[in-house]
Amino acid sequence: MPAYPREGKIIQIHSYKHNGTIHRIWQETVVLKGTSAYVIGGNDKTLVMEADGRTWVTREPAICFFHAKHWFNIIAMIREDGVYYYCNLSSPFVWDDEALKYIDYDLDIKVFPDMTYMLLDEDEYERHRREMNYPDVIDRILKNNVQKLIGWIQERKGPFAPEFIDKWYGVFQAYQK
């Protein structure tokens, strides 16, 4: 069994908190590229279930990027006025045939079409760090990965490169036909 989902497979994405509780589930994402290092997925109008049972449906197509070594994942939301990115500071992903899974560590970076960005949820991170006793090593890793992610944004690296989204959104659209 490979440690990653195969291309074309429709998978769920499960986000957990550090204490092991479920945080959020995305019902359907099509795998556009799956390797042991990273998974690229696409979804549109997918059902999302929150930990408290509330559900909602995503509003626009999105290309998702998960890495097996970096402590973040990146969701590019394709809107009429441009591509918006939502970056979650998280554990690297794991794949177990049930779903692609990761631990959400509260800190987020929102990136706008002009590539300006905002670090979000620092208060929530500090509160959960205390409540769930995040180890100091995790705190250091996450803070280092915030800087790495900002570097990627500034350098237009990986998912932040315009050709990345153009390519993978095209692949996703081909699966939608």
UniProtKB/Swiss-Prot annotation:
Natural source organism: Geobacillus thermodenitrificans (strain NG80-2)
Protein purpose: Has nucleoside phosphatase activity towards nucleoside triphosphates and nucleoside diphosphates.
Catalytic activity: a ribonucleoside 5'-triphosphate + H2O = a ribonucleoside 5'-diphosphate + phosphate + H(+); a ribonucleoside 5'-diphosphate + H2O = a ribonucleoside 5'-phosphate + phosphate + H(+)
Superkingdom as given in the UniProt entry: Bacteria
Pfam families noted in UniProt: DUF402
Keyword set, alphabetical order: Hydrolase, Magnesium, Metal-binding
Record family assignment: Belongs to the Ntdp family.
HAMAP family: Ntdp
Chain positions recorded as Mg(2+) 2 binding sites: 106, 108, 121, 124
Protein name as catalogued: Nucleoside triphosphate/diphosphate phosphatase
Cofactor: Mg(2+)
Annotated EC: 3.6.1.15, 3.6.1.6
